Structure formats: structure tokens, C-alpha cells
């Protein structure tokens, strides 16, 4: 997965609490057996005025002009600002996939649902927890100043506001290591491939009868 070290990006404010995973990526889009193509249907029920289904040409669908991601000032946003309990609801890894494929690298909110929080780290999306007061101030600033950007320094574990103030955030050391190096679960396993092969060779030598053999 893509490594995350330092990111500066435009901020889009999604000013609602309890954003659930079905709102992030509705259930009808989970039928796909592929891991790609979810970005165009991120927040589908909020983003479009009609009902979306897999296979539709989204370029021909009517947009909701009131939805934040459809407003010109937030086009190209790569940091999503949210309220508490972001990512609640059912477990679906498609939610961080959709956010990431839209172009978001980080989310900032006061709290997250546990499963969404864990899935985000595993897919290279950084979910940052700040206090409700810090988040509320950021909402005010983002709405007041078009083109508002934030910097996220994962090495130092700080969010840097436009006025230069720094807001510290916590992150588990192992998750931080994986993000900084771009390691997902498969990547971490492959780093141990030499040890895995050595173990398999030793096991075969000690217990050859464990290997399946074709029947004559």
C-alpha cells in the first residue's frame, strides 16, 4: 500500500455525526468482486439526487449541489473533516477503499467506530483523533476560508493548521511503522519470506509424511 509520512491537502468538512458505513458506500455497491472502482460512489446517497446502482454512468447522474464534495471550493480535497462516531454501522472494508479511491489520505474526527478505525490503518488511510474542541475550531476555519489546507506529519504525530498551530494526535507504534513504510498485512508477511521458506524446508525434512502425495 502507499506509504504515509507527511501530507498537505485541501480539507473538506462533512458536518454530521454518526456517519455510517452504508452512507460512505451503500450496500448495493458491495457486490463487486474487485477492490477498485468505489470512489465514484463514495457518499452516493448524499452526492447524487437519484438512486445509484452498480454499472450506472455517474457522469450522467444529477449531482446534489448542496453536498460538500460537489461544491467547487472543495474539489480536490484530500483530508476529510468529520464529527464523532465516524464510520459506525456494519463492518465493510469497502468504506476506507471508497474514501481512499476518491482521493482522501487522512480523516480527522473526535472518534471513530472501532472496525472502521482498524480497517483504515490496514488500507493506508490515516484516521486522526483530535478533541471535539479542536475539530470544532477546524470546522469554523475551513468554512470561513476557501482553499483551507492542513498539514499532517505522521513522524511527529501532529496536524499543523493554516496559522501554524500544532495539534498532537496519538497513534499505535506498530500502525505508525506500517503506514510510514507502506506495509499492509501481505507486505509484512512477505518480509518474512526467507524465514517461511526455511521453516517449510525444515518441516518437510522432519515430517515428510505431512506432505500430500498423488495417489498412484
Swiss-Prot record:
Keywords linked to the UniProt accession: Amino-acid biosynthesis, Branched-chain amino acid biosynthesis, Leucine biosynthesis, Lyase
GO MF annotation, one: 3-isopropylmalate dehydratase activity
EC identifiers of the protein: 4.2.1.33
Enzyme class at the top of the EC tree: lyase
Gene Ontology biological process terms, A to Z: L-leucine biosynthetic process
Pathway: Amino-acid biosynthesis; L-leucine biosynthesis; L-leucine from 3-methyl-2-oxobutanoate: step 2/4
Highest taxon of source: Bacteria
One term under GO cellular component: 3-isopropylmalate dehydratase complex
Pfam families per UniProt: Aconitase_C
Protein name from the UniProt record: 3-isopropylmalate dehydratase small subunit
Keyword Transmembrane listed: no
Role: Catalyzes the isomerization between 2-isopropylmalate and 3-isopropylmalate, via the formation of 2-isopropylmaleate.
CDD domains: IPMI_Swivel (cd01577)
Complexes and interactors: Heterodimer of LeuC and LeuD.
Secretion signal span: none
PANTHER family for this protein: 3-ISOPROPYLMALATE DEHYDRATASE SMALL SUBUNIT (PTHR43345:SF5), 3-ISOPROPYLMALATE DEHYDRATASE SMALL SUBUNIT 2-RELATED-RELATED (PTHR43345)
UniProt record similarity statement: Belongs to the LeuD family. LeuD type 1 subfamily.
Catalytic activity: (2R,3S)-3-isopropylmalate = (2S)-2-isopropylmalate
